C-alpha cells in the first residue's frame, strides 16, 4: 500500500523543493525517496517514472511562475509593469532554481498536456505587459524572445552566483530594465504613423481657397 499522506501532488511538491535545494540535475527517485523516508519503489505507486516526476515539477513551476508575473504586473503598465514582472521573474528563479530549470527544460508531450496551459499563463502575462508599449502585434514575438533571453540569462547567472565583479548587481538589473524600457518605447514610436505625414495628407485633402 502507498504510504499514508503521499499523493502524486505531494511527491511532486517534495521533488520540486528538493530540486531547488540540490539542483534539478541531481534529483532522482532514489534521492527523493530517501528524503521522504520511503523506499524508492514506493514512489512509483504515485509517480510512474523519473520523467513523469520531472514533467510534473515543470508544470508546477510554470503555473507558479505565470501566477507570480501576473500578480506582479496587476494594475500596472509600461515601465512599471516591466520592472515588476522582471523582478518577479528574478525572484522566482533565485528562490526556485531547481523547479525553474525543470520548467525551462520541459516540452509538451501532446495537445492535452497541462504544461501547455501552464506555459500559456506565462506568455499571457508578458503579452499583456508588452501591449502597454503599443508594439505592433507582428513584433510582439521578437520582443518576447528578447525579454526571455535577457531576463533568463540574468536570473540564471545570478542564481548560480555568476556575477563576481564587485559592482552592485541590483544596479546592473535596474540599468538593464531601463535599457529594455527605452528599446520597447523606441520600437513603438518607430512603428507609429508620422504625425507630420498625417497632417500633410490632411492639408492636401483640403479644398483650395
Predicted regions and their residues:
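An amphipathic alpha-helix adjacent to DNA-recognition modules
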Residues: 8-16, 20, 25-26, 37, ...
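Hydrophobic alpha-helical connector segments
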Residues: 56, 70-101, 110, 123, ...
Amino acid at each position: 500500500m502507498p504510504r499514508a499522506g503521499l499523493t502524486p501532488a505531494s511527491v511532486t511538491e517534495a521533488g520540486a523543493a528538493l530540486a531547488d535545494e540540490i539542483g534539478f540535475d541531481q534529483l532522482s527517485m532514489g534521492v527523493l525517496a530517501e528524503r521522504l523516508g520511503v523506499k524508492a519503489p514506493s514512489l512509483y505507486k504515485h509517480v510512474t517514472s523519473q520523467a513523469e516526476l520531472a514533467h510534473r515539477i515543470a508544470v508546477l513551476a510554470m503555473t507558479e511562475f505565470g501566477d507570480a508575473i501576473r500578480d506582479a504586473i496587476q494594475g500596472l503598465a509600461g515601465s512599471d509593469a516591466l520592472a515588476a514582472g522582471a523582478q518577479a521573474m528574478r525572484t522566482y528563479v533565485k528562490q526556485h532554481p531547481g523547479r525553474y530549470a525543470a520548467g525551462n527544460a520541459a516540452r509538451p508531450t501532446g495537445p492535452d498536456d497541462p504544461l501547455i496551459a501552464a506555459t500559456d499563463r506565462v506568455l499571457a502575462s508578458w503579452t499583456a505587459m508588452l501591449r502597454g508599449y503599443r508594439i505592433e502585434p507582428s513584433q510582439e514575438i521578437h520582443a518576447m524572445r528578447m525579454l526571455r533571453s535577457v531576463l533568463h540569462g540574468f536570473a540564471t547567472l545570478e542564481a548560480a552566483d555568476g556575477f563576481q565583479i564587485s559592482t552592485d548587481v541590483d544596479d546592473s538589473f535596474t540599468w538593464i530594465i531601463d535599457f529594455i524600457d527605452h528599446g520597447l518605447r523606441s520600437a513603438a514610436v518607430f512603428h507609429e504613423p508620422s504625425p507630420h505625414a498625417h497632417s500633410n495628407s490632411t492639408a492636401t485633402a483640403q479644398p483650395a481657397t
